[in-house]
Curated annotation (Swiss-Prot):
The active site is at residue 61. It catalyses: Hydrolyzes single-stranded DNA or mismatched double-stranded DNA and polynucleotides, releasing free uracil. The gene is ung. This is Uracil-DNA glycosylase. Its main location: cytoplasm. It holds the Pfam family UDG. It comes from Neisseria meningitidis serogroup A / serotype 4A (strain DSM 15465 / Z2491). Coiled coil: none annotated. The keyword Kinase does not apply. It is found in: Cytoplasm. Keywords: Cytoplasm, DNA damage, DNA repair, Hydrolase.
Length: 219
């Protein structure tokens, strides 16, 4: 199994998946603003090929502010103010990765292109309404994504930040993967253990031990 089409082609034919796409399409047609734009909803899969995934960082649902979401968890487009959770991720990187300096932007495309799957478990949201698409059925699809990676790939790193992401641990066989958990990088919880977790250097050490090129976290 080498491609996302191999891994997810059957899932995309399931009635529930077609119902999700139709529900989102109907909301857009009715004038509801939905983020990310339709062309960006599956960006995580477009930028990170199935057979090139090295690490998975799980988010919840997309940013719901104008111009922010572009299909990658925690990432925002160039020119958009860096959100607080991402700024805290950068602060942890600054202490964890030698030579990392906090960039002036929040675009994580360079990580995605190196094999970091930046996966939100819910892939769309209404403008200004956090979790508004939480019940559409996206999680059934993204749970399948996690299961397929955990079944058909080896030596991946899963970064699960916060209780919500950590619920997905049950989908992963920990014997063949590195599962890293910490509080969410949100300002509400980062000081409870996200700061100091050193997940980025741990990920690179694990990848190197298994003969996999480490990730250049610098942006």
């Amino acid at each position: 199994m080498d491609t996302w089409h191999d891994a997810l082609g059957g899932e995309k034919q399931q009635p529930y998946f077609q119902e999700i796409l139709n529900a989102v399409r109907q909301e857009r047609l009715s004038g509801q603003i939905i983020y990310p734009p339709a062309a960006d909803v599956f960006n995580a899969f477009r930028l990170t090929a199935f057979d090139r995934v090295k690490a998975v960082i799980l988010g919840q649902d997309p940013y719901h502010g104008a111009g922010q979401a572009h299909g990658l968890a925690f990432s925002v487009r160039q020119g958009i103010r860096i959100p607080p959770s991402l700024l805290n991720i950068y602060k942890e990187l600054e202490t964890d990765i030698e030579g990392f300096s906090i960039p002036a932007h929040g675009c994580l495309t360079a990580w995605a292109e190196q094999g970091v799957l930046l996966l939100n478990t819910v892939l769309t949201v209404r403008a200004g309404q956090a979790h508004s698409h939480a019940l559409l059925g996206w999680e059934r699809f993204t749970d399948t994504v996690i299961r397929q990676l955990a079944t058909h790939r080896k030596h991946l790193v899963f970064m699960l930040w916060g209780g919500y992401a950590q619920q997905k641990r049950k989908l992963i066989d920990s014997q063949n993967y590195l599962i890293l958990t910490a509080p969410h990088p949100s300002p509400l919880s980062a000081y409870r253990g996200f700061f100091g977790c050193r997940h980025f250097s741990q990920a690179n050490s694990y990848l190197s031990r298994h003969g996999i090129d480490p990730i250049n976290w610098k942006l």
